[in-house]
């Protein structure tokens, strides 16, 4: 189901939004505007939020999360007739996200008062599986990961990883799917020393990056104002 309101028992921490909050009344400079495909905002007028095509193709058809995005034929099993009609009217392209629904399920509205998820219990299962594997029990970590996915996402999933690093990579794959659009991938890329390869992933030519792991472009620079106002920071700290 679409994560449009804070009514799921899996939410542990969130930003609770009210219709009268300035982030809503000031216009469309808010999370639903940038992420929502079926409400009015930046995303629905062309700044579509789309999944990496290669990652999408790695999601099994038996995984319910595959419906969080439109497929190559602009279809999702997770959408009802009203949602399909709105996606068609807006012209949502293939691989557009359907994970985040509009506020109260009302199509095309500009009252973007959806609550914003910050932490869900699903992430805790993934953290546990990785911790078990990297703590010396890869078989336990693999079992934890498989049970979570089997119970809640894909009954056909089998974790074949046997080494600690292989289980860690399997967890990372699940994190990329489960936590898509929740602001965690950048930190995983740094933490796990991964690169960003967008070749063949459906991105516009100007954004087809192939950044190797550990590249300096992955590190945010210290703002110039901080460098100027803090005598303990020098230009060399940014190089």
Model-predicted segments: where are they?
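Residue-level signal for threonine
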Residues: 51-53, 223
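Acidic/polar-rich alpha-helix caps and helix-coil junctions
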Residues: 1-2, 6-29, 40, 46, ...
């Amino acid at each position: 189901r679409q994560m449009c309101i804070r009514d799921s028992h899996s939410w542990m921490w969130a930003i609770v939004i009210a219709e009268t909050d300035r982030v809503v009344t000031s216009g469309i400079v808010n999370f639903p505007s940038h992420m929502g495909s079926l409400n009015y905002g930046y995303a629905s007028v062309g700044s579509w939020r789309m999944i990496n095509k290669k990652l999408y193709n790695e999601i099994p058809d038996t995984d319910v999360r595959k419906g969080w995005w439109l497929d190559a034929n602009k279809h999702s099993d997770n959408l009802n007739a009203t949602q399909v009609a709105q996606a068609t009217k807006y012209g949502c392209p293939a691989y557009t996200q359907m994970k985040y629904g509009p506020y109260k399920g009302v199509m095309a509205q500009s009252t973007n008062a959806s609550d914003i998820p910050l932490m869900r219990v699903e992430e805790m299962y993934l953290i546990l599986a990785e911790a078990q594997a990297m703590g010396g029990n890869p078989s336990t970590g693999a079992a934890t990961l498989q049970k979570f996915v089997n119970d809640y996402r894909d009954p056909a999933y089998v974790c074949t990883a046997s080494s600690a690093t292989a289980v860690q990579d399997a967890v990372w794959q699940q994190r990329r799917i489960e936590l898509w659009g929740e602001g965690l991938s950048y930190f995983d890329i740094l933490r796990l020393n991964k690169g960003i390869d967008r070749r063949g992933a459906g991105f516009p030519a100007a954004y087809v990056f192939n950044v190797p792991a550990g590249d300096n472009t992955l590190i945010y620079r210290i703002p110039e104002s901080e460098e100027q106002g803090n005598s303990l920071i020098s230009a060399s700290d940014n190089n």
